[in-house]
Each structure stands twice: as structure tokens, then as C-alpha cells.
A protein has these predicted regions:
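Histidine-centered active-site/metal-ligand motif
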Residues: 174
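Ser/Thr-glycine-rich phosphate-binding loops at phosphate-binding pockets of nucleotides
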Residues: 177, 181-182
Length: 281
């Protein structure tokens, strides 16, 4: 029977030396900053700036960054982050993941908001019961994982918003691959700022063009299963957003009743992270 990586091995991600290059983005003007930031030790590091939110105002560049884990950053990468004036990181990785690949960035505040990865454990449970996991099984597991973000992980996402509302100091939030926990967090932030849902989905799917899966990771699992587990799909994020709508009556209700982001807090979020109207566009 083929085996999937255990949760502990999933945490043990080998470093990589693939440098990501700026990804052309048709939504950006020619003089706009690069969305994807080239780092030797993180392939999925990118800026949420430039999208158009409430009132036609643009999300500020160089304030909100999403990424895969930061434990493999090189000294040159550290210099890039210093140049970006990164002041704090938010780490969504579970305890084993963050312990296996810990990091510390000089002068940068570290905020762990643990969301334990469950999809690998559930896949292992299926295998132990005698079921050979298929790609479709993996899709269902991923959708269930995203549904769990909406309620089970709500306190962690509330913690992220609390930090963002405290100041607009440049912030990197990340998990291991920067695609699922980080992807839902980025979607919440952008939608709270008024970025249209189709644009949010566009940003979410950029992971498939950028993220480099660590070499040798999960090689005993079928390739089609690995493709599901290490990439993102529209249906994954839609599963979470559907839960927000059906269970909570929409984004505004979810933000206020579940995450504690009321109208005043949403207004402050916009003040901190959207360019003034005269500077938008």
C-alpha cells in the first residue's frame, strides 16, 4: 500500500534553492511594484497590494504579504525583507511544523497563531482502514479542511485581524506552503477591504504558478493525489466561502459575529490598508 507522509514528516520540509521571479499581472500597471517577491528560500512570497477595494481605493502596496514558511530564508532574503520593512510575521503552522522548521528574523515580531494541519492525518486514517486514497478523496478532504477554517479556526483568523487593526506595520502571514490556511486568510482580508470575489480568487490561484513543492516530499503517494494536496483549486476556497454565506449569512455577518470585526473595525481596516481616494487608481 502506498503511504502518505505522516504529520511529522509533513512538517520536515527540506529547504529549496529555487528563486521565484516576479509574476506578470494583467491587473497591475507597468510601474506597479512586483506582486511576487523573489526569494531563494520561499517561492510563494507575494504582496496583496494593488487590488481595488471599497470606493475604488487601491490596497496599499508593501503592507500585507503572504508566504510559504520562512525557515529556509537566506541572508540575502533577510536583507530583502529588511528592505520591505517587514515588522511582524504571523505563523499559522501547527506545533510540529513550526518546531521542525523554526525561524527568527532580527527585529521582526513573531506571532504564532496555530492551526494544526488535519488533511494528512485524515488521509492516513483512510489508508489504515484499508482504503487507498484517490485524487477525488483528496479533493473531498481539502474541501472539508477549508470548511473547518470557517468555524474551527476562527479564533486564529480573529487574532490576525486584531494584529492588523493595531497598526499597518508591514506584516507577513504564512503557513507551510502558503496556500490553504494562508489562502483563506488572504481571501478574508481582501474581501473585508472590498476586493471583488473574482479578483480574490485570482490572487488565491497564483499559488499554482509560484509555489515549488519541496523535493522528495510525499513521493510515496500517487502523483494525482500529491497534485491535489500541493496545489489549490477554486472548489477549495469556494467550500469555505460557501460556509461563510450559508452558515453565517454572508461576509459582513461572519466578520462581525465570528471574528469580532464590526463596522467600525472594518472602517479602520480600510483606513489602514487602502490608499486615500485621491491616490487610488
Amino acid at each position: 500500500m502506498s503511504s502518505l507522509p505522516t504529520p511529522s514528516s509533513a512538517a520536515s520540509l527540506p529547504t529549496h534553492s529555487i528563486t521565484s521571479h516576479a509574476l506578470p499581472d494583467a491587473t497591475l500597471g507597468g510601474s506597479a511594484p512586483s506582486r511576487s517577491i523573489a526569494l531563494a528560500g520561499a517561492s510563494n512570497f507575494r504582496d496583496l497590494g494593488g487590488y481595488i477595494g471599497h470606493g475604488g481605493q487601491q490596497v496599499k502596496w508593501r503592507r500585507l504579504f503572504r508566504s510559504d514558511h520562512l525557515a529556509a530564508l537566506t541572508p540575502q532574503d533577510h536583507a530583502v525583507l529588511a528592505g520591505l520593512r517587514v515588522a511582524r510575521t504571523v505563523d499559522f503552522r501547527g506545533q510540529a511544523e513550526s518546531a521542525a522548521y523554526a525561524y527568527a528574523l532580527p527585529g521582526v515580531a513573531y506571532h504564532p497563531l496555530r492551526i494544526e494541519p488535519t488533511v494528512i492525518q485524515r488521509a492516513l486514517d483512510l489508508q489504515r482502514s484499508g482504503h487507498q486514497i484517490t485524487a477525488q478523496d483528496a479533493v473531498v478532504l481539502m474541501q472539508d479542511t477549508y470548511r473547518g477554517f470557517v468555524n474551527d479556526s476562527a479564533p486564529r483568523f480573529a487574532g490576525l485581524f486584531e494584529l492588523l487593526l493595531d497598526s499597518d506595520a508591514p506584516t507577513v502571514f504564512h503557513c507551510t506552503a502558503g496556500k490553504d490556511r494562508t489562502g483563506f486568510a488572504a481571501a478574508l482580508i481582501l474581501m473585508a477591504l472590498g476586493v471583488p470575489r473574482d479578483v480574490v480568487m485570482h490572487d488565491y490561484l497564483l499559488t499554482n504558478a509560484l509555489y515549488q513543492r519541496p523535493q522528495g516530499m510525499g513521493t510515496h503517494a500517487p502523483d494525482d493525489v500529491l497534485t491535489v494536496l500541493w496545489r489549490v483549486q477554486v472548489d477549495f476556497l469556494e467550500a469555505a466561502l460557501h460556509g461563510v454565506e450559508v452558515e453565517h449569512g454572508g461576509l459582513d455577518n461572519y466578520l462581525e459575529r465570528v471574528l469580532g470585526i464590526n463596522a467600525a473595525a472594518q472602517k479602520r481596516l480600510a483606513l489602514l490598508y487602502l490608499e486615500p481616494s485621491s491616490a487610488a487608481g
